[in-house]
Amino acid sequence: MSSLYRDLDSDVSSTRIVRHSYNVYRGSSPSSQNRLESRIRELEDSLDSEREMRLRYEKQSAELTFQLDQMADRLEDAMGTSTTVSEVSRKREAEVNKVRKDLELSCAQFEATEQNMRRRHQEALNDLTDQLEHMGKSKSRAEKEKNQLIIEIDSLQAMNDGLQKSKMSADSKIDALEGSNSRLKAAVDDLTRQLNDSNLSKARLTQENFDLQHQVQELDGANAGLAKAKAQLQILCDDLKRNLDDESRQRQNLQVQLAAIQSDYDNLNARYEEESENASSLRAQLSSLSATYAALKTKYDKELMAKQEELEEIRRRLSIKIQELEDTCEQLRTRCNTLEKTKNKLTVEIREITIELENTQIIVQDLTKRNRQLENENAALQKRCDDLSAENGQLRNEKANLEAECARLKVANAELAEKNANLERENAGLQNALREANNELKAANRTINELTALKAQLEAERDNLASALRDTEEALRDAEAKLAAAQAALNQLRSEMEQRLREKDEEIDSIRKSSARAIDELQRTLVEVETRYKTEISRIKKKYETDIRELEGALDNANRANAEYLKQIKSLQNRNRELELQLEEATRQLDDTRNQLSVSERKRITIQQELEDARSLLEHAERARKNAENELGEVTVRLTEVQLQVTALTNDKRRMEADIAAMQSDLDDALNGQRAAEERADRLQAEVNRLADELRQEQDNYKNAESLRKQLEIEIREITVRLEEAEAFAQREGKRQIAKLQARIRDLENELEADQRRLREAAASARKFERQWKETVQASDEDRRQVAELTSITDQLTMKCKTYKRMIEEAEDVASITMNKYRKAQSLIDEAEQRADMAEKNLQTVRRSRSMSVSREVTRVVRV
């Protein structure tokens, strides 16, 4: 109808203008007559066409004159809609260009992120393969130790058989000794003859007494060395106490930092609630807009039922837009749900951090218990030193009394029983250490399961990125198809407008020129807006690039710190090797002294060999304990490495969350410009669906990881049960053999007391000194070993505390960076909204001016 009115007005104005021109040029000069005749012919042709059109429109003139006043307003509205259609087409072209540029930028960003993710994924795979190889080696080592234990058990069984055979031979010897005793009773008379020999033996005993005094002096020197070692142990205990105080302070600092992190989390939760309220307000605005749009739609449906097919097509497009806006609303709801899920994940991670802090507190309590044990052992060493000094005084006073030395032999038997009890206590300590090692192995397996889950998550993210790239390509194709359709529609409109413009006169040309000027002004404003958006996008891109560079620099600094910590660990290992060399030198000196004492113990070789067999069994147990301690150290080192990898992965995860927050800001920008960027909303919908798929895949991967973890825990429990059974069997066999050896030693000592009292008493005194010296040396070695263990444990705890501090600092840095990014994005959104409002106001003013100018020109033509 609007086009019909426009044609009718143009025809009426042209007829009136022709008549007016004819009346003007009828009496002109003959110089311009030729030019006017050609003009008159053209005007006559136009008059003929106008007469035909007038005959065609005379029937409608009566109705149109009656409705002319009413349709003037409608004409203004229709002209406004036509201009809006042209403006919408131009805006769509500009938006298509923007979408292409955004797609190119997103493709470049996706390619860069894909390369980074591939590199990180490859590094994580390499680390995991190294850890799996290391675990395989440790497993093979455990199997070898198991085979060695089986071999040792077989050897113990063989030794048991040999001991039974030696028992039989000892019984036969006892029978022979009883016969010899009867013969000795018969030879009492011969002993009187041997009084002279006894005098000679007395002189020999005095010489041996002199030698024993010399040995007592040497033992005094050894006592002085033990006192020095005692002082050194006291210094080490003081250092350990200081370290424990420092660790308690560090634990308090960690608790304070955890409280700060909790407060930050509460602040973030409050901000999230504010954002949800803003989203609800946006939804309310959308609902109000949809209501207003429905009212306008009903109004125009009642008024414009008789319009052409172009307006119907525009109506269909608007209905499609409404559906797309409703889809975007649903997408926003799903995105809010995903944000709530991420919030739940963050709460779970905070709970895991609290669990790790509780584990550190348990480790500190274990260290305090070990410190108390060291203090108790130090008190026991002091008691031993006092006992040694008392025994030295007793030896000096009881040199002349052989009967008192027999009582001392009984005391030595009691000391052997005490030594057996001490060995049982040490065995219990070894069992506790093995249990701790098993607990740490369980923790290591738990961390390995977490790493496998993270690996699966990274693979799922890689697949999701590939699917997102495919979706973006499909969206680009759809956008190109829509652009081609829009261009075809524009071409059709252009051809129709050209046909109509050819039929119009010069006055309508002036109107067209004025409209072209207004359109040029609108295009200039649109170009300015586009340039502003482009500059803002480039500036935001530069900011993100600078943030990425800063994060890469922080990662390089963390790698450097890790290298420094590895250097410190190597230096500590070198120091440990030096201490082991010193221990080897001390053992060599002990071997020399043992060789010297073996000369005085030739008559007791058989008993000494049996005792050495028992000691070899104890040494095997100590070696197994050392191997378990070494494995424990390796497990702790492995745990530190796994923790570092977990921190790196958490940093990557936080970076991905920052990227997701940036995408959220982009989505908010798209909501602000949803009427002008519909295709961008489709792309965001695809990204939301992709994120939902990623969450589902992560849940599936988590379930698979849980099943694998349960299987590994079952296998570890079976292995620990087998090891405990083997240890219990070895302990039982060792106790039985020790009891048998003690019984045999008592029997042989009783026999030797009956036959060779004097020689046995001297040898027993020398043996007692040797035994005491060996006990003191072994006690000092055990104390040194325990001190070394405590130092290694304290170093490991300090490393763990440092790693926890570094993790907390990194978390604070990431939180501050994300907050800064969020504030920057919020400021950018506010600026973009202000600019959009200004642009809308400018467009409205231009439209009003355009509609006013067009209405004025139409009224002027109608009046003419």
UniProtKB/Swiss-Prot annotation:
It comes from the Eukaryota. Most abundantly expressed in muscle tissues from byssus retractor and adductor muscles. Low expression in foot, gill, inner mantle and outer mantle. It is found in: Cytoplasm, Myofibril. Pfam families: Myosin_tail_1 (PF01576). Keywords: Coiled coil, Cytoplasm, Motor protein, Muscle protein, Myosin, Phosphoprotein, Thick filament. Residues 1-30, 854-864 are annotated as: Nonhelical region. Phosphorylated. One of its GO terms (cellular component) is myosin complex. Transmembrane segments: none annotated. Belongs to the paramyosin family. Paramyosin is a major structural component of many thick filaments isolated from invertebrate muscles. This is Paramyosin. It comes from Mytilus galloprovincialis.
